[in-house]
Amino acid sequence: LGLNQDYDLSYNFSPKDLVIVGAQRGHGKSFACCNMAVNAQNAGRSVLYFTIEMDQRPILQRMCSMATGVPLGRLIKRNLYEKEWKRIGQWWADRFDGGSEVLADWNVAEDFDKFHYALTRKCELKDKAQLDVFYDPSLTLAKIISTVRQKKIEYPDLGMVIVDYLNQVRRHNAPSRSGQYEWTEQIEISKGLKALAQDQEVLVISAFQTDPKGQVRFSKGIEDAVDASYT
C-alpha cells in the first residue's frame, strides 16, 4: 500500500478487503490515501478516489507531486524548474491516449494551462492505470456503490477504491437524526463498504477520523466489518 515499509511487509491484502486508516483531523489522512493511490497506479491498476472535503484539484496536485517528485508547495505556486515542468507535463500526458503527441507541441513551462486545455479537448483518458477523483460534499453509500459499478465497466483494471473519509459518508441524502457523526450510521457504512469490496472484487481503503487518543467512538462496531485497521 505504501503506508510504510514495516506495514507493507506485515500485510498482504486481497481485492475483496476493506482497510481503514485512522488519524486525527489534519494529521495526514488524505496524504496517506493519495500515496496509496499513486502506488496502485504505479503497479498498473486504476484507482477511484472519493473525496468529501477537498475537490479534485488539490487531490490531483498531491498525486502529481508524489508521482513526479516535485515538491507540493512549489507545484501549487508554480515556482518550478523547467525539468520539473516537463515531469509534470509528462505525468498529465501519460493519463491520456495520444497525450505525448499533444505534449510535444507545447512548452509546458510557459503554457501549461493551454497544454492542459488542449490535452483534455483532443484526447480521451486511458482505460487503464487511471486515477479518477470523484468529489461530492454530500457523498452517500448508495452513490459510492453506483459509481464503483459504473467505473468498473469503464476501467476493467480497477483495483482500489478510496473513500476520504468514512465519518462523513451518509447512508442517504436525509440528514442524520443524531448529527453528522452518528455512530450507528458509521457502522452501517463500514459494512456497506465491505460488501462493496466483496461484490466488485476491489480493495477498498477508507480513512476515518479519530479522537486525540487514536480512537473513534464505538470503533469496535465499525471495525467488525474491516479486514485491517491502521492508526
Segments and roles (model prediction):
Residues N35-A43:
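Walker A/P-loop NTP-binding motif
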Residues K77-L80, D132-D136, R171-I187:
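Flexible beta-alpha connector loops of hexameric P-loop NTPases
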Residues S14-A23, R45:
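Pre-Walker A (Motif I) flank of P-loop NTPase domains
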Residues G26, T184-T231:
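Phosphate-binding/switch region of NTP-binding enzymes
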Residues N4, D8-S10, N42-P156, G214, ...:
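Cytosolic-facing regulatory segments adjacent to core modules
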Residues A32-M36, I59:
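Hydrophobic positions on the alpha1 helix immediately C-terminal to the Walker A/P-loop
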